[in-house]
A protein has these predicted regions:
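Membrane-lumen/periplasm interface segments of specific transmembrane helices
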Residues: 24-33, 201-291
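Short hydrophobic/aromatic helix or loop-helix immediately within or flanking a transmembrane segment
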Residues: 47-82
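Membrane-water interface signatures at transmembrane helix termini and the short loops
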Residues: 123-134, 278-350
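Short hydrophobic alpha-helices at membrane interfaces in multi-pass membrane enzymes
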Residues: 151-167, 197-204
Length: 414
């Protein structure tokens, strides 16, 4: 019996260790309340209109009735965060066990630890500014879709699930199309190349992407609520919950245009965001640099131009992040999603045995064996950063900027 339990612990060591680590972080660091700016999405449902962000409230009301207690919503968020921790851990363990080569296994383990220690680990979703964000459910969906891709063999069932879950996720928040949809595009691109450009596969992949794009466009431009007066909407919502609702998100989402968002939220702070954004990118070079290095190895090792093109197109899926960085001011959320998707892409392609990524992981594993201290320092370095917030920048980024500014002033004698 003891031997059997020991074998199970050894087999599922990654899942167990990652789950315990994440759940422990959730236990000791979770914010005490749902962030005020997002709590309204737990109350709004389809009785108020039709469109994105109304799905979550509708689902909750199926179980709670017409009145939602604040404590109920908070417990729901905690439960979903716990599920996310388990899903990420299971995904990591699946990939680790699939690696048979020792170097690839070591590289996969490094990427898992590297991600869990990074500012974009699931722990960013229970910081004060992100507690209860709809990004939680988008992340859960992205992990589930990755698992479906890895485990479901039937092509038609797989893409039906992609379409249904993708549309459901967009109904939770249409920003999915910019934040996590790139990971789904990478999977469809891999399928197209893997099929040898079979017409049926191309049609299925493109149709899925097109239909999800149509769902997004409808949710973004053709949906809305049945209220023309903000005060009436707030009064009606407040009568159905004990949550102290925040008015600004309702006004911004349903009574502003995209132009209003840009000029009222983004433009006044754009210079500061660009400044701190550049510093964030610079300080987190070890993270994105590691992923980019693997992609470059995959491109270099491509046996022909067609193989190289696949990886270039996969990299270009990241262009989807440009609109949200340009138009919306929650740069912490955008950075977090970007790094999450890079991690998911590596895990999925490693699991399915993509040749280029496999060669990149093998080289990474060999590099880790030659210089383990360097990679340990990388992990310790990224672990020194706090987790991404919503609007605010990483504390270390701001300190770096002001310390550098003070140093410059001291050198110049000002």
């Amino acid at each position: 019996m003891i031997s059997r339990v020991k074998n199970l612990f050894e087999k599922y060591a990654v899942e167990i260790a990652a789950s315990l680590y994440l759940v422990y972080l959730l236990y000791i660091n979770v914010a005490e309340t749902i962030y005020g700016y997002v709590n309204v999405w737990y109350v709004l449902d389809y009785s108020y209109g039709f469109g994105s962000r109304l799905m979550l409230g509708t689902l909750l009301h199926l179980f709670t009735g017409d009145f939602l207690e604040e404590e109920t919503a908070y417990r729901f968020v905690i439960a979903m965060l716990g599920i996310l921790c388990v899903l990420v851990s299971v995904l990591a363990g699946m990939v680790y066990r699939k690696m048979k080569d020792d170097n690839k296994k070591l590289a996969a383990l490094f990427l898992i630890v590297f991600y869990l220690a990074s500012p974009a680990s699931p722990a960013y979703l229970w910081t004060r500014e992100n507690m209860g964000r709809l990004d939680t459910y988008l992340f859960i969906s992205a992990v589930i879709l990755a698992m479906i891709y890895m485990k479901v063999k039937n092509r038609y069932m797989k893409y039906v699930l992609f379409l249904v879950i993708g549309a459901f996720t967009i109904s939770i928040h249409q920003v999915y199309i910019f934040l996590f949809f790139p990971s789904l595009l990478v999977m469809t691109l891999h399928d197209i190349w893997q099929s040898g450009f079979e017409k049926k596969q191309i049609l299925i992949s493109l149709s899925t992407a097109f239909l999800l794009g149509c769902v997004f466009l409808y949710m973004q431009f053709c949906s809305g609520i049945y209220y023309d007066n903000l005060d009436e909407l707030v009064a009606e919502l407040s009568s159905h919950t004990s949550i102290g609702l925040s008015v600004p998100p309702l006004e911004a989402e349903y009574f502003w245009t995209i132009k209003d968002h840009f000029y009222k939220n983004q433009l006044p702070e754009l210079r500061e965001r660009i400044r701190f954004g550049i510093i964030t990118v610079a300080l987190l070079t070890p993270i994105w640099g590691t992923y980019l290095w693997i992609w470059i190895q995959a491109i270099r090792n491509g046996k022909d131009k067609l193989a190289k093109t696949k990886y270039i197109l996969m990299l270009l899926t990241n262009v989807a992040y440009v609109p949200v960085f340009v138009l919306m001011n929650d740069w912490g959320r955008w950075f977090a999603a970007f790094f999450i998707v890079q991690f998911l892409n590596m895990m999925v392609l490693a699991y399915v045995g993509d040749e280029g990524i496999a060669q990149g992981l093998e080289k990474l594993g060999k590099a880790i064996r030659r210089n383990p201290v360097i990679f340990l320092v990388f992990v310790l370095y990224v672990a020194s950063f706090e987790k991404f917030q919503g609007l605010n920048y990483l504390e270390q980024v701001e300190r770096f900027y002001y310390a550098t500014y003070d140093l410059k002033e001291w050198i110049l004698g000002r």
